[in-house]
C-alpha cells in the first residue's frame, strides 16, 4: 500500500508504504522507540532498551495488526501495533495501540494514516475498541488522539515516575 502525503506548507509529495513489522525492522524500530525513551514521556522506560527487546514487540502483537512505515528508499519512518488488552476471551474485541513516528517525520500526517491503517486492520479482525495508554506529560499525544476520535475514559493519578517526574496515565478509547 502506498500513500501520498502532501503538506500545505511544502510543495513536495512524500511516498511511503506500510507493511507488517518483521525481523528486518528490528534495529530501526528499536532506534525510533529508544529515541522516545530518551527524549520524551511517550515511551515509559527510563533507559534505552537493547535490540533484543524487539522480540517483546513481536510477542505482544502476535495475531494483531502491525505496521512498519517506510519511505520510498525503504528506510523506516515509523511503526505501530495493536496488542492484547486482557487475555480473557471476554475482552477479545478490545486492543491497545502503540505507535511511534521518527521525530523528523512528525506533523506530516503519517501518524494519522498509520492510525487509520491499524483501525481498518483491527476491524477486519473484529476488534471494536482501541485503547491508548498515554502519559499526562505527553499533551501532544493526548491532543492527537482527541483529534482522531478518542475520548478520555480514565486516569490513574500519579502512578508513573520517569526521570524524577511523577505523571498520571491517561486512558483513551475509540470505539470503531
Locations of the language-model features?
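Acetyl-CoA-dependent GNAT
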Residues: 46-104, 115, 175
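Conserved GNAT acetyl-CoA-binding A-motif
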Residues: 122-134
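Helix-loop element at the rim of GNAT/NAT acetyltransferase active sites that forms part
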Residues: 31-48, 57
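Active-site acidic-Proline motif in GNAT/NAT acetyltransferases
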Residues: 99-104, 108, 120, 136-137
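Conserved beta-strand-loop-alpha-helix junction that forms the acyl-donor binding cleft
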Residues: 132-142
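Conserved acetyl-CoA-binding loop-helix of GNAT-fold acetyltransferases
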Residues: 107-124, 143-147
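Conserved catalytic-core motifs of GNAT/GCN5-like acyltransferases
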Residues: 84, 131-134, 151-168
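A short beta-loop-alpha structural element at the N-terminal edge
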Residues: 15-29
